[in-house]
Amino acid sequence: KLSRGHSPLMKKVFDVYLCFLQKHQSEMALKNVFTALRSLIYKFPSTFYEGRADMCASLCYEVLKCCNSKLSSIRTEASQLLYFLMRNNFDYTGKKSFVRTHLQVIISLSQLIADVVGIGGTRFQQSLSIINNCANSDRLIKHTSFSSDVKDLTKRIRTVLMATAQMKEHENDPEMLVDLQYSLAKSYASTPELRKTWLDSMARIHVKNGDLSEAAMCYVHVTALVAEYLTRKEADLALQREPPVFPYSHTSCQRKSRGGMFRQGCTAFRVITPNIDEEASMMEDVGMQDVHFNEDVLMELLEQCADGLWKAERLRAGLLTSINSSSPSMKSGGTLETTHLYDTLHRPYSKVTEVITRAAGSWDLLPGGLFGQGFFEDEDGKEYIYKEPKLTPLSEISQRLLKLYSDKFGSENVKMIQDSGKVNPKDLDSKFAYIQVTHVTPFFDEKELQERKTEFERCHNIRRFMFEMPFTQTGKRQGGVEEQCKRRTILTAIHCFPYVKKRIPVMYQHHTDLNPIEVAIDEMSKKVAELHQLCSSAEVDMIKLQLKLQGSVSVQVNAGPLAYARAFLDDTNTKRYPDNKVKLLKEVFRQFVEACGQALAVNERLIKEDQLEYQEEMKANYREIRKELSDIIVPRICPGEDKRATKFPAHLQRHQRDTNKHSGSRVDQFILSCVTLPHEPHVGTCFVMCKLRTTFRANHWFCQAQEEAMGNGREKEPGL
């Protein structure tokens, strides 16, 4: 009794029972063995539900194997025995849970997948149904959580079996393969060792494909998982040392033990990613002796975590401080260990400044959808945000997805939708799979812009994205500036980027329509923001500055600003539009003239003698466009007369405020280059959206207008 049923004699008796299950027996003999095991479990429950879990684990493994027997009678007996093990465990804990049995069933299943051919087939599924039926028909536990807990366990088992079978089918589809492994890792949330195994496997796939940010996030989740496990293990030890006077409450004990070596658990990593809260869902088993996870393992994982973040260029001082504070060796005073850890962290710390200026250049997001129930099945109509590494062009992403699904379904059955507009599935031919792709940008509201002051913060932990589509009230896509409207779509993903996966489903979306004068305000605000951002950079990119200037003041390409001014600010037209919008557009134009003047001054300071003539030409063009705008806008525009800052829309304020400390490093530079400067090869980020649908329909969002602009390098016409 003192050893909780784990005496040498009990071990020998149990091994005899287990031997009957391990060796081939007659049907009648096995039925008697199941009856005897049921009696053993009933008489000695502490053997299976307290202390070491090895006997419970061995029994679960053999009984699960019998659940796959060719004989229906054996499958029924095995299913009923497994149900009895769960039910008895539930009663033993005072009708609270059967965590011990739950955990050992999941662990045994993972071993069976590797050891037993055909596990998970029809026979095994029938056994799972028998277990569910037993739970549903058991009246004694009708008003408890037991029945739902049993359903949850069988659902997890089915998820593991289905994902394992599908992995071979999708071994050439990295996104789907990672999704399947993620579903396994999620199903093993109650089993730290197995969850770590699948997260490590996901990290290897990401490294192989060059998705270093996602690999780093896998390392972060693994490290947080181990930290959380050690926190709870410490709480269990504290409970054993000082048994509580009141009824047992693991949560209260855990709170008391937070002052120990592992006082924070996974919450210490929340500064790196809010997605880390997933690791807090770990189920607890006081008797589980997992000797693999200890302080040394955590130290190794912390080093791996820092190295992974450094390689992904996603380090900053705050992240390293979090890793530092999570390290028990920093607190325990071990000189050699502390010296080694500081040496490991020195390299990332020394690179933090450089990394912050380049981190934004590692993004490429693709939100999207697939159309075609007959091909994509459960994926039909789903929208995803994809994150692609660094300078991946939109055309390359589209071609990769087209080839991927062409290989799966046949090239004659897959089509790309060359349009970013909304697709009605009823208009699609059910014989084909359709893919639709479009480019998106990060979206921040005013509060987020105030909180995300650094460039790093604006390309890390991003959850909302935006794309725009031009339209007119007459139904045409393009029209004159006085009739050109724009629909802005804001997408919210389920998780923040970067994540352990490179594609994340879209949770919901919000649409906002901009009328013609609002489009003018939006487009002109972008021009002002671009010029301000370039002029305020620590290292001004003179080539980009001159290109932006030329696109703003040169006579041959100034149709955009002048067209907006004539359409909305001319005395004969202003009465058609709301006074507040007209006033705002006038203010934006004043800022535009001021920004052009500032950009000319910066350019004049940087140029050499061979560009003096070019500078004088741009100054002359600037004076000309300023004069024309002054003739249109009342009161007249005079440079320097109004220093008030324009109140830009929230999504544009980031352009106004951001500072480019390194050429081509900002996320929104690439976004804007898709509109006005598509030919810049050094810019580093892109966001896109992909939508799939199958009836043999795959819906892929694809900005044809942007691709055309990238092909000819010209600035877009007004309202495009």
UniProtKB/Swiss-Prot annotation:
Gene3D superfamilies the UniProt entry points to: 1.20.58.740, 1.25.40.410
The UniProt record lists the keyword Membrane: yes
Domain remark from Swiss-Prot or TrEMBL: The DOCKER domain is necessary and sufficient for the GEF activity.
Organism (species): Rattus norvegicus (Rat)
Entry's Gene Ontology cellular component terms: endomembrane system; membrane
Gene: Dock9
Location, primary (coarse class): membrane
Other comments on record: 'Zizim' means 'spike' in Hebrew.
Stated name of the protein: Dedicator of cytokinesis protein 9
Sequence similarity: Belongs to the DOCK family.
Top-level taxon: Eukaryota
Span of domain DOCKER: 186-638
